[in-house]
From Swiss-Prot:
Organism annotation: Homo sapiens
Listed InterPro entries: Znf_C2H2_sf, Znf_C2H2_type
Main subcellular localisation: nucleus
Family stated for the protein in its record: Belongs to the krueppel C2H2-type zinc-finger protein family.
Keywords per UniProt: DNA-binding, Metal-binding, Nucleus, Repeat, Transcription, Transcription regulation, Zinc, Zinc-finger
Full protein name: Zinc finger protein 619
Function: May be involved in transcriptional regulation.
Biological process terms in GO annotation: regulation of transcription by RNA polymerase II
Disulfide bonds: none
GO molecular-function terms, A-Z: DNA-binding transcription factor activity, RNA polymerase II-specific; RNA polymerase II transcription regulatory region sequence-specific DNA binding; zinc ion binding
C2H2-type zinc finger segments: 188-210, 216-238, 244-266, 272-294, 300-322, 328-350, 356-378, 384-406, 412-434, 440-462
Localization of this protein: Nucleus
Taxonomic lineage from the root: Eukaryota, Metazoa, Chordata, Craniata, Vertebrata
Domain of life from the UniProt record: Eukaryota
GO cellular component, one term: nucleus
Length: 560
């Protein structure tokens, strides 16, 4: 910073003749808006911006020295003596001190003896250490908000009163004498969030949070980071380096902080408790995330669609849906995934690992979320309730999909034809119409299908065919569906199913055993339908009575 030219002002106290005096002033200035803005326990710092000013003049005379630092204008008036000396407190009892600040223009004017104005937090202790420049004598100063001190007496009462007024002041100014560079606290306030940082390098790094600047890039996966230290920690994921090992269980970690958190699990320490529900946590970060459930706070928003999240990691993973980023690749099948946790779950498909087992029925699961949903079937717990129809759900994803029935939301759009869908799986199935993909192939005949439901129905056809061609056909009486499994008498007409035409006799009905679907084949009227046979109804999973003789002389007269 340049050194602004000093200037002299006011009457000459001892005439215009005399020796040339020289006074040096080193100034460091920082002005936060209010004293309460400075956080307690803030870190100490070396000196912030400084300005050195030199007074040249013939003394003794009263000089007004003008300095400027970071847009703050500082004027100091002192009685200068020949040889660069100043009058002390005892020699100049009538010296006046007047400090004022205009908050809008950040203009600070100090008039009086050069002094230290301590910033934070121990004003009383720091006030007693204030020094006159170029002397060893201490002086006490007044309030920094338009206060005039007529006499600087060293009484205890005055010192306490001055310290109290300083605490109420909103001025944060540092003046350092040429006798030494005392360590002062200089805080830099963020204009975006209002938080203070010290030193200036921390303030500069903090600004990347608001600008979203991430200058450090991982060469392996392309992930970017704000800080070089976080990049170094991230690279250990790719190298597999885990230098920190737990002495209890031998589990290794890439970061020492993760090891310390893990060790709390062995000790059973859960020092962080939720004041709303009483739930305890091993880590403060988990408590903070948990409390957002009660407050409903979702501070992290997707820049593409505006969707809000309570956890920053969930927001990052969600944004990869828009940009298509999938940095994690499965070494078994080459599939790319959006997060490391999803990759771990996917790998269990290849390994067959199912670490989550239900104690009620013994069923095991790959993923914890599916396991928790399954447990709700046993407990009957329904966490999610629709306000429109009062239907309840045990799974949040099903609840969200259900709500789209009422609001008509269809967020998934086909890029080929523009058709929209309420569920992503429906969109995936629809896209197979355009791509021609048929992922479900029958091992019996090689026929392929676009949809899983059609594939399952096709497989049942092979099962029925095997039963008919083999010995699996049970000799049971035909039954009428409208009579609720009552025996079908000769010449019985089914009013519910039979179309207009000839009455249905038992010789036209075929009933398969309980292990396969049940269906009736009815002769159709030539006027109603030119087809020789009409499928009237289709039943699945019906229970049938015991074996009896088949009424039809030729049960397979209608070919399947």
């Amino acid at each position: 910073m340049g050194q602004p030219a000093p200037y002299a002002e006011g009457p000459i106290q001892g005439g215009d003749a005399g020796e040339l005096c020289k006074c040096d002033f080193l100034v460091s200035i920082s002005i936060p808006q209010t004293r309460s803005d400075i956080p307690a326990g803030a870190r100490r710092s070396s000196m912030g911006p400084r300005s050195l000013d030199t007074c040249w003049g013939r003394g003794p005379e009263r000089h007004v020295h003008r300095l400027e630092c970071n847009g703050v204008i500082f004027t100091h008036r002192n009685l200068c003596l020949p040889g660069g000396k100043t009058k002390t407190e005892n020699e100049e009892k009538t010296a006046q001190l007047n400090i004022s600040k205009e908050s809008e223009s950040h203009r600070l004017i100090v008039e009086g003896l050069l002094m230290d104005v301590p910033q934070h937090p121990d004003f009383k202790d720091r006030l007693e250490k204030s020094q006159l420049h170029d002397t060893g004598n201490k002086t006490k100063i007044g309030d920094c908000t338009d206060l005039t001190v007529q006499d600087h007496e060293s009484s205890t009462t005055e010192r306490e009163e001055i310290a109290r007024k300083l605490e109420e002041s909103s001025v944060s100014t540092h003046l350092i004498t040429k006798q030494g560079f005392a360590k002062e606290q200089v805080f830099y306030k963020c204009g975006e969030c209002g938080s203070y940082y010290n030193p200036h390098s921390d303030f500069h790094l903090h600004q990347r949070v608001h600008t979203n600047e991430k200058p450090y890039t991982c060469k392996e996966c392309g992930k970017t980071f704000r800080y070089n230290s976080k990049l170094s920690r991230h690279q250990k994921i790719h190298t597999g380096e885990k230098p920190y090992s737990c002495e209890e269980c031998g589990q290794a970690f890439s970061q020492n902080s993760h090891l310390l958190q893990h060790q709390k699990l062995h000790g059973g320490q859960r020092p962080y408790e939720c004041t709303d529900c009483g739930k305890t946590f091993s880590y403060n970060s988990k408590l903070i995330r948990h409390q957002r459930i009660h407050t409903g706070e979702k501070p992290f928003k997707c820049k593409e669609c505006g969707k809000a999240f309570s956890c920053s990691y969930d927001c990052i993973i969600h944004e990869r849906i828009h940009n298509g980023e999938k940095p994690y690749e499965c070494k078994e099948c080459g599939k790319s995934l959006s997060s490391n946790s999803v990759l771990i779950q996917h790998q269990r498909i290849h390994t067959g690992e199912k670490p989550y087992e239900c104690k009620e029925c013994g069923k095991a699961f790959h993923r914890s979320s599916v396991f928790l949903q399954h447990q709700r079937f046993h407990t009957g717990e329904q966490l999610y309730k629709c306000n429109e129809c009062w239907k309840t759900f045990s799974c949040s994803s099903r609840f969200i999909v259900h709500q789209r029935i009422h609001n008509g939301e269809k967020p998934y759009e086909c890029q080929e034809c523009g058709k929209t869908f309420s569920q992503k799986i429906t969109l995936v199935q629809h896209q197979r119409v355009h791509t021609g993909e048929k992922p479900y192939e029958c091992k019996e005949c090689g026929k392929a299908f676009r949809w899983n439901a059609s594939f399952i129905q096709h497989q049942k056809w092979h099962t029925r065919k095997k039963l008919i061609n083999g010995t699996g056909l049970s000799a049971v009486k035909p039954y009428c569906p409208c009579a609720i499994l009552s025996p079908l008498p000769p010449q019985h007409t089914c009013s519910a199913l039979a179309p207009p035409g000839p009455p249905l006799s038992s010789s036209h009905a075929v009933v398969l055993p309980p292990s396969v679907p049940f269906f009736l084949l009815l002769p159709s009227s030539e006027k109603a339908n030119p087809s020789p046979v009409q499928i009237a109804h289709f039943f699945q999973d019906l229970a049938f009575p015991g074996k009896s003789s088949l009424q039809s002389p030729n049960p397979l007269s209608h070919s399947l």
